A protein has these predicted regions:
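A short small-residue
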Residues: 62-66, 378-380
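A short acidic, helix-capping loop that chelates divalent metal ions and anchors anionic groups
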Residues: 68-72
Length: 431
């Protein structure tokens, strides 16, 4: 069967691939979007049951469609988010083909462009957009060996408390996923140990405005790079149960045991860094700094927003902070499960072109790779802090589509003298 030809192949039909399709269509660029599973599959099957979007409905959406929920301040459940993307594909008539996996992309030896092998046949294309995002392969540290009576799963495999065996739970990682899962388990009556590393801890809301609004008006969504020394700092924010500021001191007051970064495992014991107090202090400082900036903004503009003294209240230091736990014998304290909320890595093994660094990360500028014709979409900090959010990837997709359209204008350019000669030939031929 001959290879199918199209201009641009978009790999992945999550939020990035769908946004890419909309902007390519706006430019009239022929394209196909391939998805190995279903549209927005990760939202349906790689998240826990109670997950909601971390931003309110008015914010975490594409500009051209609202969520069906009439409450625009609601945090949308994961299934409704997936349905939103399915509906959006229909709205823009995106050429999505599900159940097709891209196996290999190589540069063509002649004629320019790329040869693409997929489970649904071969393609010849001029441009590739890798819209698979950054959250592909779960990272589980090879720290604790398998053992009878100890269940170990990554956060992407966690669904609900009933899934775990009876007993205490160790959660490693206190970003948004780890913090939300740990709180859910605690509220379900489990004894939870939470390993807390460096983190940002923004207020869920302050003085009547969600933190997404504050990051917008304060210009923080448009930061192009992380601050010095914060490249690997995670963000702890939650929309669960209507949305509430993640406060690790509050967790401890309710019975959760906090520990520092997980470092090693020896003879049945986990060992933790002596950094819990510093990590909590830096998270608190981040929280208060945003409140201070918000207050200054309100005063400068003379806004009539209500005071919010509750957001500045601080829970007392718990015993686990003043007398930190440095080692934990899992059997002794009854830990029967470990949940690794330790992030994800990228897998671009199918993309066999020279545009990756020594660590396998894409070399690109705002999604435009160093390999002509190859583009990336959905990466954290692709162009700004907001790039990982639904609205942010939509704007990044526009930039990438505009770049592809510009390349088209170069390829179709003809000098005026040549164009006039071609017109004359055409007139004679049709004379």
């Amino acid at each position: 069967m001959p290879a199918e030809k199209t201009d641009t192949l978009v790999v992945g039909a999550g939020q990035a691939g769908i946004a890419m399709s909309e902007h390519l269509s706006a430019h009239g660029i022929a394209h196909v979007v391939l998805e190995r599973d279903r549209i927005a599959e990760r939202w349906r099957t790689s998240r826990w049951d109670s997950l909601v979007a971390n931003g309110p409905a008015w914010h975490d959406r594409f500009p051209n469609r609202d969520f069906d929920d009439p409450d625009h301040d609601a945090f949308i459940p994961k299934e409704a988010v997936a349905d939103y993307f399915v509906d959006y594909v229909g709205q823009i008539n995106a050429p999505v083909r599900c159940g097709v996996e891209v196996e290999q992309v190589t540069r063509r030896r002649a004629g320019g462009g790329f040869d693409v092998k997929t489970t649904g046949g071969d393609f010849e294309v001029q441009h590739i957009v890798a819209a698979t995002g950054a959250f592909q392969d779960p990272v589980t540290p090879a720290l604790v060996p398998p053992a009878d009576g100890l269940m170990q799963i990554h956060s992407n495999a966690y669904r609900n408390p009933a899934q775990l065996p009876k007993g205490a739970v160790m959660v490693v990682g206190a970003g948004s996923s780890g913090a939300q899962i740990a709180e859910e388990l605690m509220n379900a009556g489990r004894q939870v140990y939470l390993s807390v590393g460096p983190h940002d801890r923004p207020p869920r809301a302050y003085r009547g405005r969600d933190f997404c609004w504050w990051l917008g008006v304060l210009g923080k969504w448009d930061m192009q790079t992380p601050g010095p020394g914060t490249e690997h700092v995670t963000i702890a924010v939650s929309g669960a149960n209507g949305g509430r500021t993640v406060d690790f001191r509050r967790f401890a007051a309710q019975g959760m045991q906090l520990v520092g970064r997980t470092q090693a495992f020896r003879e049945g014991q986990l060992h933790f860094a002596d950094d819990l107090r510093a990590n909590i202090a830096k998270g608190d400082a981040n929280h208060l700094s945003l409140l201070d900036e918000a207050d200054a903004y309100i005063e400068r503009l003379g806004l009539d927003l209500p005071p919010d003294p509750e957001e500045r209240k601080r829970w007392p230091d718990p015993a686990c902070l003043t007398q930190p736990i440095r080692t934990l014998d899992l059997a002794e304290v009854g830990v029967t499960s470990i949940i690794w909320a330790t992030g994800f890595s990228c897998d671009y093994s199918w993309l066999q072109v020279d545009t990756f660094d020594a660590n396998g990360k894409p070399i690109h500028a705002r999604g435009v790779s160093k390999e002509p014709g190859i583009y990336f979409l959905g990466l954290p900090w692709q162009s700004r802090r907001g790039s990982s959010f639904i609205w942010g990837v939509w704007h990044d997709a526009k930039f990438v589509a505009d770049h592809i359209a510009t390349q088209h204008s170069y390829l179709t350019y003809r000098p005026s003298q040549q164009s006039q000669s071609e017109d004359t030939v055409n007139k004679v031929a049709t004379g």
